[in-house]
Amino acid sequence: MSIDLTNGPVTKKMMLFSLPLIAGNLLQQTYNIADTVIVGRFLGADALAAVGSSYALMTFLTSILLGLCMGSGALFSIRYGEKNEEKLKESIGASFLMIAAVAILLNGLVCRNTGWILEFLQVPQQVYDGMRTYLEVVFTGILATFLYNYFASLLRAAGESLIPLIFLAVCAVLNIVLDLWFVIGLDAGIAGAAVATVLSQWISGIGIAVYTWGRCPQFRLRRRDFRITKDTFGEIFQFSFLTCVQQSVMNLGILMVQGLVNSFGPIVMAAFAAAVKIDSFAYMPVQDFGNAFSTFVAQNYGAGKQERIREGARKSVLLVLGFCLVISASVFVFAKQLLLIFVQPYETEILAVGIQYLRIEGVFYFGIGFLFLFYGYYRAVRKPGMSVVLTVISLGTRVVLAYVLSAVPQIGVSGIWSAVPIGWILADIAGWIYYKKLQQR
């Protein structure tokens, strides 16, 4: 059922829309984590390091497509708020052609350059073969990732967040079952875990595409809608390209940090791989709430309801702050227990590094929570360039400080972890200053 975010109680409408979004991405994290848990438990620390380190690279690559889909989704939401069906269909057809072309190009580039990419990331020899095997299989699912994210963005733009959740739930359950079958039942190793992920992605991507075209007449396009005019290209470029840049810069920074982590060896790599999974799972709800907030703002921006946007912003800040305080306390207290999901109790060195990471970064989840709200807001009010600026501040600070601090012998690897919240908070300050300037105009 689609939710009209331009009318009715603000908090209730945002929560009804965001909860399936949050549940969906928690499921997505669950099936991402499934690879890591099963590989770490049954194939050992080197395999865990290989699969966990692959996650940073895959996140960077898929962030390009995700950014394009998110940017298009903001435009779809504005068109939906304007009740302009003709313009909406033009935007859908043109953006599909543009993003599909990028997905095909990206798939070809990464498949041909896997070896060079691993060398750039300074992957240790003992995990090189496993990481290459995993990536070569997982890369075949890039087009499936495009299909799911594109049609999920389209449905969410119309206030429909439950259907994407259903397809993601099927994908998550299937991935876990196939992981167990390939890795344990068939003894297929790292390649088996990758095949399980790819099969699940294709089923989810094709399924949601068929549903959207078949069951949503407002999105059923005519042949003439599949064309790219100068005006349509300009609008999609404005939203999608800058959102893509923002997502790519964010994940490129993470990828550069991954390269630095790799230089500390397999123990730190394995700890980082496990801790990042926990980290992502912990703040995923506020990331999804930020996306829901973006849809809320975009629909009301299209409808010209500025006061409703301000009310939604105030209430969203309080909701995010409350959630982050609870999650930060939980991660700090239960850091060891959470890491034991991924590693064995006797792997004490990995546990020590992972606990250090979670307790330094986890205290500051409110920083990333507010940042996701700023990202969503600026994307929705046609200021996606500001999201890029905030990302550059956050990730630039993180990367520079990570390299500088970790080079100090007395600080070492903990400097990489400390750089993260500093970047978040500096970006939040910049986002708030610009928000106040916009309100004064």
Language-model region placement:
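Short alpha-helical transmembrane segments in multi-pass integral membrane proteins
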Residues: 1-18, 76-141, 185-241, 297-364, ...
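Small-residue-rich hydrophobic transmembrane alpha-helices
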Residues: 48-108, 145-164, 271-335, 368-390
